[in-house]
Amino acid sequence: MGASAAAISALAVPAFAQQARPAAQQTTVIEELVVTAQKKEEALQDVPIAVSAFSQDSLQAQKIDGGPNLQQAIPNVSFARSNFTNSFNFQIRGIGAKAVGASADQGVGVHMNNAPQQSGNLFESEFYDVERVEVLRGPQGTLYGRNATGGVVNVITAKPTDQFEANARAEYGNYNAIRLRGMVNMPILGDKLAVRVAGTMLKRDGFVTNTFNNHVVDDRDLYSTRVQVMFNPTEKLRTNFLWERFHEDDSRARTGKQLCTKDPGPATVGGVPTGAAARYLTQGCLPGSLYAPAAYGSVNTSGTLTGLLGNIFGFTSGDSNAGATTSTNLREIETALDPLYQSNSNTYQFTLNYDLSDALTFTAMTSYGKGSVYTSQDYNRVVSPIPFNSTPFTPGGFFNDPQVGNTNKFTTIDVSSGRSEQFSQEFRLQSAFDGPLNFNVGGIHFTYRTLTDYYVIGNSLTLSSMALNFQKTGNPACNPSTTANCIGIDTSATPTGDGHNYYDNRTPYTLVSDALFGEVYYQVNEDLKFTLGLRQTRDKKAVKNYSTVLLAPGYGLTLNPTNPDQRARFTETTGRVGFDYKANLGFTDDTLLYAFYSKGYKGGGINPGVPAGAIGISQTFAPEFVNAIEIGTKNTLADGSVLLNATGFRYDYKGYQISKIVNRTSVNENVDAKIWGFELESIWSPVRNLKLNATVGYLNTKIGDGVSSIDTMNRTQSNPAYTVVKVGPQASSVGANCVLNTVGVATILGAGAGATLPWACTGAAAYQAFLSTPAAAGGAGLPAATAAFLANSTGLFNYANGFSIEGVAANLSGNELPNSPHWTTSVGAQYTFELSGGWSATLRGDYYRQSQQFARVYNTEYDRLKAWDNGNITLKFDKPDWGVTIDAYVKNIGNKIPIIDAYTTDDSSGLFTNVITAEPRLYGIAISKSW
């Protein structure tokens, strides 16, 4: 479908070409925008693809500062950052990046100057000195270097020219925001050699208040610079070199506020009081609405791995967060540690175009990028009000943890970091023959290497490690005050990854991808053209597995062997076929009709490392496939003063990749789905100086029949015949949840053995062995007959059909895909007032609304995210003769704080929810000068 409103209206330059017509009419012709969506320059209205394009002026006019703002101007698009390092979900028509892990590919390919960016800064950096930002909707693998089942975002930088030009912009806004942008273009040898230098910086105060220490966090301190060199030694040979650097060092919050409907644990089970055993029967948080007052509770620490171990070893007694609630203000947090965010990247590109003849052009495009990210923040987002018990390990309730520091509070920190390197080499041959047959073919080699580290560091984990140093095998050399000589405890302030007193999910990952792709065009006549595109892709993925087992052997636990290194190969042929036709309808000036069938593909991958034997985890996940049908029309009407474009689409999706967190790791699964919808985009200039625009997107998604998945937030599906129990430290999945028969649990409680329930989660035989093991050896010390009865004769492990110790799978049939609102709409209007002295004033307003959606495939009330809207207004004064522009703006006029996405953690973390919110009201004033 066609141009977005912003795509065609450029505010800092004349947006319309006036035609000679009677003064009474005073209508205007909307300026034509040239794009390269098909790797060649074409008028946007002539491109048979659903594409929205934005010039730098358009981005500025609509206050689209970066990738997250694009959703407010494009139908059927949603955007949210993810929970982990340098990750985000840009979703088009329900397809995005819901799989989590180093080997998971984006469903929407992000490109810079047509080169794929596996790890980019789309959600961190801001747009500056760009020629265009193009967003293509639908599968695009036959022309773009990395497969993209959902679409493509292509950021095209402004290139050096043979004319001197420069501009500078200084902006000041609320939150003490200072934003500077500038560019200078310097021709050196006429049209043969030129250099273009551009840059941007942003420094502002934070949006969030940490009420624990009164610090303002989630600030920004970042900059980016870009240098390009154009060298065209001949008319036939044209080259361009680019270097771009990005740097950030601030307190950006990787996640938003943490919500939890506290689970206090049941007072009774089967009519039997639980007493102190209730601490082993809580899952931390319950699946309540994120908008209910109860959602501002705190995690029951007994439902977490760290709290479970603290209770078992006596450092804590139940919920360390008892009585704690959080502020109902989504921009207030309470954490012992302020967030830290550091990011650096360098990108290098070299593009060569050589005209082999007047009708044949060869293109070589080389791209290399390298980057690193380091982030840390408080994991539980609340300061526990109850101190540690006073024990030999915690004298006076205090403990000096090597990573957390000296405190008497239950404290957990997560550190997410990574470094990456990528290289791509693409060759392309494109024809422009006079005859009916033309082509655009190419090949790409792409390599990507990354090492991601995700740590969860807790003083309760270190305390448990020390306790186990003295248990069973005994290690009297372990010093509980200094942690010196304690087996498996990392004494470094910055974790090295060698200790087992913290959780470290370390993933070295390598991707090697090769592909041949291209399209052939047959022009039957001047109005009708057929297109055939094919792509052959081969992906090779490898992950080196590291043990993620906490509390390793040598001090009390049995270590399952680490899973072997994983390798996977995926090979697939995809393509598209269709036609476009320029129709003469009589009532339009120009009409383009098009229809295409395409097959999209995204490779499968390898789930992040887990200990062998962990419950319910597959080592790999399968590829995605989509069969897509799209029909559309692009129309120019009313003597060029109206653009009206429409697209309808239907997708048959096989293997849509989704993720959930199980046993402290991301587990990616596949589901089938149907997707259909339509999009409308229109621009109208009824009179001179007035422009109106509107977009409407409708999206319907439906998961296929027979699809099911265990919902870790509700493992029993609310069936009272079963009870959730925490998994004890004897299992590789320690801290997770299991499901046991309620009658059996009640019998165990009635026998006074409720404290042994966590050891039941590995089955009857292991439970019986624990019960009968002497207490001095770490067991319960019960008589053999009693142990046999409790493990085998209580019905503890009796399950109906479909149930298991993991729970029962929820039926997903007919559910909606996550982050897929039914409706996305936007409207805009601007009017330019001509003032005296060569000045003009342009007033513009934009409004966007998104209907409700679900954060997960389970579509429960807990998953429901409410509809939200946003309004922006700008006022700009121009004096072209001076090259001066002064503008003022307000973004998010209503200062609303919508929840735009939510992340559910795993059972061992208490099933809390990190929510992602939009920016608050922002306003400011700026002055620009161009030369």
Locate the predicted segments by residue.
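Membrane-embedded beta-barrel scaffold of Gram-negative outer-membrane proteins
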Residues: 351-357, 361-367, 373-377, 582, ...
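A surface-exposed, glycine/aromatic-enriched loop/edge motif typical of exported proteins
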Residues: 239, 243-318, 373-396, 449-486, ...
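Structural signature of Gram-negative outer-membrane beta-barrels, strongest in the C-terminal barrel
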Residues: 230-232, 429-432, 438, 442-446, ...
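Gram-negative outer-membrane beta-barrel transporters
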Residues: 527-530, 650-652, 669-857, 926-930
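C-terminal beta-signal and adjacent terminal beta-strands/loops
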Residues: 31, 456-459, 463, 701, ...
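Periplasmic-side early beta-strands and strand-to-turn transitions of outer-membrane beta-barrels
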Residues: 154, 161-163, 169-171, 187-285, ...
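Outer-membrane beta-barrel translocator/receptor signature
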Residues: 105-107, 119, 128-137, 142-225, ...
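Acidic, small-polar-rich N-terminal luminal/periplasmic segments of exported/outer-membrane proteins
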Residues: 29-163, 631
